[in-house]
Amino acid sequence: MASPFAETTIEQAVQNLLNEYADCLDNDRLEEWPEHFIEDGCYFVQPRENIDAGLDGGYWMYHTSKAMLRDRVTSLRHINTYNKYYCRHLITNVKVVQQDDENFEANSNFLLVQVNFEGKIDSI
């Protein structure tokens, strides 16, 4: 059995990446956010209910390139301005679950809390 500490360096790097990613979003550095992705990287948000039901698709958001992520930032800055809010991402339990010479897969848990300018709180 491999040591549970064998992946610590990679897990710390993943944790640092996720922290920086969240910091961009939480501190209104939206223009920096797409730089956490490769040019043809995918970003999608799928409702947990769809995953639990075994449904493929039904995404809230589905972006397939860094250019689409930049478009999302433009939309947030200039179009979707009706409901301004502050957000905080809390990320825990980062774990590398699979690794080879060139790639790895990591899982984590997160909680997103949004507070709008009127004081309404949503946790996602």
Where on the chain are the PLM-derived regions?
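Beta-strand elements of well-folded, non-transmembrane domains
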Residues: 110-116
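Short, low-complexity N-terminal intrinsically disordered segments enriched in polar/charged residues
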Residues: 1-31, 35-39
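Short, intrinsically disordered, charge-balanced linker/junction segments flanking boundaries
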Residues: 118-124
